[in-house]
Amino acid sequence: WIFMSNINNNLQYIQQKANSPATFVELCEGRYNRIIETIAKNVAENEKIEIIMLAGPSSAGKTTTAKKMREALKKNGVNSYAISLDDFYLNNCDAPRFPDGTPDFETVHALDIPFFYEVMKQILETGEADIPEFDFLTGKRKEEFNHIKIQDREVIIVEGLHALNPIITKELPSDRLFKIYINVSSRIYDNGKEIVLNKRNMRFVRRLVRDYNFRGNSVERTLEMWVTVRYGEDTYLFPYRHNADVKINTIHLYETCVLKDTAIKLLKEVKSDSGFYKESQRL
């Protein structure tokens, strides 16, 4: 299945719909919710499925999609638990390193893979396990774990950049998995010709605003991190996206209207002597 069609991604269409913002938001959200509900219904009807693997690049909407999937599954009589692969990071001091000595948090080997296998084995065999939580402020796994106990016909949603990587999935029973890949898969065009915002830049704008509002990151810090983020996606995600059973386009056309003022304001703050000035002006 590929849920990517029937999207009018012309700038002129967006500008027209923006005149009725509430209706535009409802239209975009409705489209995405229907996709999630269709998938949830199919999962609920297939009793063999016990684990949903949900992968996507940075700012594709993994956490939001996992939340919506849980809600949609519940409507279909199936409870679920969400597990983030980010909580299986090795402590920063144990992380793999680039040749210059800086930590490589994008590689799949930045995760404690044997521990992930152990947790998933416990869930599948006993129905319960202690789930770790990673503290990104300290760069360490928290001492406290979250205990989960699943009942019959409950589903685990594992979300993360590496959720489709065979290194992560090879120890899991393939006949009990359902794999989802999400990404912004539409560009914004001017009259169907010139690209005014490509797919990767759309995700960057999402991340730029998110990191500023919720993580206290400057524009330059986000631009600096984006270099390694892109490396991680190109190396550890995109080669495995075709392993998915379903691919979903997570673009919400109204978001360009919502994010533009904050994004432009932030990008204008980059000084002319910055190494990121040219890129900020382009965006």
Where are the language model's segments positioned?
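Charged, amphipathic alpha-helical linker segments immediately N-terminal to NTP-binding catalytic cores
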Residues: 1-38
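Hydrophobic anchor at the beta1->P-loop junction of P-loop NTPases
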Residues: 52-54
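P-loop (Walker A) phosphate-binding loop of NTP-binding proteins
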Residues: 57
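Conserved glycine(s) of the Walker
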Residues: 61
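Post-Walker A helix-loop "phosphate-sensing" segment adjacent to the P-loop in P-loop NTPases
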Residues: 71-81
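Conserved nucleotide-sensing/catalytic segment adjacent to the nucleotide-binding pocket
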Residues: 81-83, 90-139, 155
